[in-house]
Amino acid sequence: MKILLHTCCAPCLIYPYAQMSKKGVKASGFFYNPNIYPNQEYQFRRQALIALSGKQNIDIIYAEYNPREYFTAIQNKESSPERCAICWSIRLKRTASAAKENGFDMFTTTLLVSPYQDQDTIKEIGNKIAREEKIGFYYEDFRPGFKTAYAQAKQDGLYCQQYCGCMYSNEAWIYRTK
């Protein structure tokens, strides 16, 4: 089975990729994250993913970085609780499309490793997109491996971000650290 794995960052890829490999799944990453802000943060995450994929021989598809796609999608919802669901949805929809275009059997996301993301909503969105796009959504609760993955990333000298990615989560992180 071949699965395209939406990848938000290198640390979050470590555990899901290892778990799927143990099960005999051929997983490839898909780095599509128009939400990441600012551009410098995007580049840090992209470079960390390049380093990890080179070290572990992981195939990654890098989509174009276009933050306008994110801001258009969340327009008038910037301070709404719906903002995160919209963000997950645009990334999973693009991943499903890329999976179909590139001959994958299913798609999934590294967002499922984070204890900070709404697992149920992501699963619901993934299943909805799977029905619409007529491709399977692979669900697994990867959260048990979150701490181990981040420890491994730090040990390997990979960049580990302090916030989800968007400018709103960045502002919230800055506020919390004051």
Q: Predicted segments — roles?
A:
Residues 1-178:
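Nucleotide-activated chemistry modules centered on ATP-dependent adenylation/adenylyltransferase
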